[in-house]
């Protein structure tokens, strides 16, 4: 082995295998580009992005870690989302969930966020 060399197994690596996925059409209604990172809770993205927010609770973009998707002003594109795994607790982001995804009904903040996004 050479120092710094990376040896990988033959074949393809299957990412997010067996997890629920969702395709959603997303429109940027704002006047600025919006970029969403690979692990951002999609439900809590910028309110200028219009899509079925309720359906995306507990999902993130199904893209490689460390990458992002950019939505230009006026652009509509379909993205694939994948369900969070593990404990499924979400903290931070826009502060709309702040806890376990499976035990908490949509919070008042989340409902307000959703209403603001639809206005």
UniProtKB/Swiss-Prot annotation:
SUPFAM superfamilies: Urease, beta-subunit (SSF51278). It is an enzyme of class 3 (hydrolase). Heterotrimer of UreA (gamma), UreB (beta) and UreC (alpha) subunits. Three heterotrimers associate to form the active enzyme. InterPro entries: Urease_beta-like, Urease_betasu_sf, Urease_subunit. HAMAP family: Urease_beta. It catalyses: urea + 2 H2O + H(+) = hydrogencarbonate + 2 NH4(+). Belongs to the urease beta subunit family. GO terms for biological process: urea catabolic process. Transmembrane segments: none annotated. Its EC number is 3.5.1.5. This is Urease subunit beta. It is found in: Cytoplasm. Its main location: cytoplasm. GO terms for molecular function: urease activity. Keywords: Cytoplasm, Hydrolase. Pathway: Nitrogen metabolism; urea degradation; CO(2) and NH(3) from urea (urease route): step 1/1. It comes from Tolumonas auensis (strain DSM 9187 / NBRC 110442 / TA 4). GO terms for cellular component: urease complex.
